[in-house]
């Protein structure tokens, strides 16, 4: 008798995988185990909750029970997996255990909080659960500091500013989105945020946070003090690999998987933000959607390697949205930038004259798909 497939996690990757499995097999036993409620919500919406006056519960799209009924699943919400015995094919919680034929780790990633004095005063917005824990404080806060000027930090800075709050956005780097693109490309967004009233503190580092009667005092390494009501850490995500380590599978930055999404153990797979696919961590929606399609086939007896095409990454800053694709972080590209009132096109060219990356903004985003077809990968 089939023991079926167990998926640990309940986020976007887990749900996409369930839907793809059920398209092909209505009966294989499917069990999902997760530490949260397993209710569905759209994680990218967290970048806009403040300006849209949304409460955490407003984000819920489908209750866990409805999901289980729709896709014929066994669900175990609010359940912490304590251990995995890979040889025995057993998953263990504190008071239960489950046997499996195939196991999928969809454990996601956790927000990195800088190890400074007062780090416990920092808030994170990496899940509906985290937002629920701090939504009152964030709604009431008038002065907000966001630490980290990457994708999420830039999105949050614009959102809080649109909600009428005083926003300070801080990063160690000399420009926003520094790990994604050079300063001459990100400067359009940087100038727009400044024009909106966001205070940018670049080439700056936080030293400590202290609770005060009026709120929180943030002290920079430069010894400058800034008084705020809330501090949000947007300093990146760390793939959740603890369970994989316990199972004895190979781990690097994420859970190491090959083109079949298979770990170093033949019956354990990983998908989503926790996975490192052939050395790459790809915490974006499109690679996860494609991964779910291929992994579903392979779990059901197929043998199809994942092939990822050139894909768009969207920066959800509504007043100046951006799409980017290719190797935008490469330092050896020559950038050709056309900036006009209706938007920007920035093309990253190799020494051989090949288009290796591009960034488009505003009305020029409609040209993204045509550029995608000419991208050298």
Curated annotation (Swiss-Prot):
GO terms for cellular component: cytoplasm. Its cofactor is FAD. Its EC number is 1.18.1.-. GO terms for molecular function: oxidoreductase activity, acting on iron-sulfur proteins as donors, NAD or NADP as acceptor. Its main location: cytoplasm. Belongs to the FAD-dependent oxidoreductase family. This is Nitric oxide reductase FlRd-NAD(+) reductase. It comes from Salmonella schwarzengrund (strain CVM19633). The lineage of its organism: Bacteria, Pseudomonadati, Pseudomonadota, Gammaproteobacteria, Enterobacterales. The gene is norW.
């Amino acid at each position: 008798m089939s023991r079926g497939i167990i998926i640990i996690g309940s986020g976007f990757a887990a749900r996409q995988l369930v839907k793809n499995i059920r398209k092909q097999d209505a009966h294989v036993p499917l069990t999902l185990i997760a530490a949260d409620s397993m209710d569905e919500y759209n994680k990218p919406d967290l970048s806009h909750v403040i300006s849209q006056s949304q409460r955490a519960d407003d984000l819920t799209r489908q209750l866990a029970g409805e999901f289980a009924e729709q896709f014929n699943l066994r669900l175990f919400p609010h359940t912490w997996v304590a251990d995995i015995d890979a040889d025995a094919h057993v998953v263990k919680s504190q008071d239960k255990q489950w046997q499996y034929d195939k196991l999928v780790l969809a454990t996601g990633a956790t927000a990195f909080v800088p190890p400074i004095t007062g780090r416990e005063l920092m808030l994170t917005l990496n899940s509906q659960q985290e937002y629920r824990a701090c939504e009152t404080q964030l709604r009431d806060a008038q002065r907000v500091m966001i630490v980290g000027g990457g994708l999420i930090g830039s999105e949050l800075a614009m959102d809080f500013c649109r909600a009428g709050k005083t926003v300070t956005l801080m990063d160690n780097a000399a420009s926003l989105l520094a790990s994604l693109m050079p300063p001459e490309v990100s400067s359009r967004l940087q100038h727009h945020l400044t024009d909106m009233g966001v205070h940018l503190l670049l080439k700056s580092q936080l030293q400590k946070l202290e609770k005060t009667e009026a709120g929180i005092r943030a002290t920079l390494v430069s010894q400058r003090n800034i008084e705020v009501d809330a501090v949000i850490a947007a300093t990146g995500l760390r793939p959740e690999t603890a369970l994989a380590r316990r199972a004895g599978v190979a781990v690097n930055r994420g859970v190491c998987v090959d083109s079949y999404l298979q770990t170093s153990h033949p019956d354990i797979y990983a998908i989503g933000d926790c996975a490192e696919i052939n050395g790459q961590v790809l915490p974006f929606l499109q690679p996860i959607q494609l991964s779910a399609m291929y992994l579903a086939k392979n779990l059901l007896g197929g043998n199809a390697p994942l092939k990822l095409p050139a894909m768009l990454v969207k920066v959800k800053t509504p007043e100046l949205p951006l799409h980017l694709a290719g190797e935008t972080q490469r330092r050896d590209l020559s950038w050709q930038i056309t900036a006009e009132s209706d938007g920007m096109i920035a093309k990253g060219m190799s020494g051989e004259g090949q288009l290796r990356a591009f960034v488009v903004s505003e009305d020029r985003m409609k040209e993204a798909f045509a550029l995608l077809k000419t991208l050298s990968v």
